[in-house]
Every structure is written in structure tokens, then in C-alpha cells.
Amino acid sequence: MNSPDQIPFNTQLYTPPAQPITSTDYFSKKGNAPKLAVDVDLEPRTVPSFSHRHTEVTKYISPVDKLSPDVETPAEVGPANFIPNMSQYRFLLVDDNSINLKILTKILLRLYPRAHIVELCDSTSVLAYLASTPPFDCVFLDIEMPVVSGTELAYRIRQSPKLCRLPLIAVTTRTQEEDLAQYKDVGIDWTFGKPFNYPYRVVLDVVDNVLRQRINEL
């Protein structure tokens, strides 16, 4: 069991409240984040049978109900008290660690069963890939990657007229105050700390809220 003080990190510098708040209050408490007790099994499992790999890209196209029987999804804390979002979102995941990509893909497919998820291990190919494919609804970025870091990618995306409104979520071990301030400066919308062991409902609320805020800006 992780510490109850472990929370998802926004790019804002939070002061946790004196008393824990429920996830229903999650986005109504501006400037604060809830304390969460989490215990999620994130051991790597078998790669889903419907994935196919070419060069550094793995695409997950089919709904989660086509997962092979031996593929397990992370355990939720308590009852499964969330309703999956059935939107056909397109998510791009960027991390030089393939295990981290598989873990995050598995979680997102549980929350968004009809999502189209693409994994990229090579951060140098991200901008060219974004320019050559249909638009994505959100990009999940590792920060510490060789050659091109997540912060540099975020900065370049925000400088692009075609990509500047693309929702960006960081998933990283670097979550000190100065790190979060830098992520905010380069335009990252939200930051999750690693290990990525948050209750499903919290992840769903965060991603939905980030997407909704960006859509409202259009």
C-alpha cells in the first residue's frame, strides 16, 4: 500500500487540504488536490494479441473486450465505481521504456475501451508522426527521454500552429515543485507521477477534464 499522501500531480503547485476530499470534489477545489490511498497492481503482463508492431510504433486498435484471456488489467481499489468512457479517442503515448507504455496502454483501454492508442518509443519521431497522421485527442509524455525530452516536445508542440491546442499530459518520476513549474511553462496540461498507480476513477476524471478544457478553448 502506498502512502495516503501520494497524489496525482497537476502542473499547478498544490497545497494539499487538511482533510481528504472525495473525487466528486476533485475539480471544484481550485488550487488543491485530494489525498489518495492507492494500491494498484501494475506488473507487466502479456502483450495484447491484437497489437502489431512496426519499427518503434505499437498500435492498439481494437476495444478492450478483445483482450486475450491471459491479459490482466490493474486491480482497482475497492469496487469498480467508474463508468468507462466509450468515446473513440485517439491517444499517443511517448516513453522510451516499453514496459511503461504497456502499463499505461492497459489502463487507458480499461477506461476508454474504444480508444485508438499508439505507442512511440522514439521521441525524435514524435513531431513527424503527429504531422503525418490524423489528429490525436491527447498525448501522454514521459519527461526523461534520450535526445528529445518530454518538455522539449511539449514546447515544440505548443509552438506549432496546427498542434498548439493538443492536450498534453506528462507521466514522470520528476515531480518536484521546480519540475512542475517548468512543465506548466512549456504548456503541459497535467502531470502524473510515476509509478502510475492511481485509482481508475481519478485517472478518468483527470483525462476527461483535460480534454474538456482544451475543447472549450476552441
Curated annotation (Swiss-Prot):
Signal peptide: none
Pfam families reported in the protein's UniProt record: Response_reg
Keyword Zinc (UniProt): no
InterPro entries: Bact_response_regulator (IPR050595), CheY-like_superfamily (IPR011006), Sig_transdc_resp-reg_receiver (IPR001789)
Domain Response regulatory: 90-209
CDD domains, per the entry: REC_hyHK_CKI1_RcsC-like
UniProt keyword annotations, A-Z: Phosphoprotein
BP GO terms, sorted: filamentous growth of a population of unicellular organisms in response to biotic stimulus; phosphorelay signal transduction system; positive regulation of filamentous growth of a population of unicellular organisms in response to biotic stimulus
Role, per record: Required for stress adaptation, morphogenesis and virulence.
PANTHER family, sorted: RESPONSE REGULATORY DOMAIN-CONTAINING PROTEIN, STRESS RESPONSE REGULATOR PROTEIN 1
UniProt-recorded name of the protein: Stress response regulator protein 1
Species name: Meyerozyma guilliermondii (strain ATCC 6260 / CBS 566 / DSM 6381 / JCM 1539 / NBRC 10279 / NRRL Y-324)
Upper lineage: Eukaryota, Fungi, Dikarya, Ascomycota, Saccharomycotina
Gene name of the record: SRR1
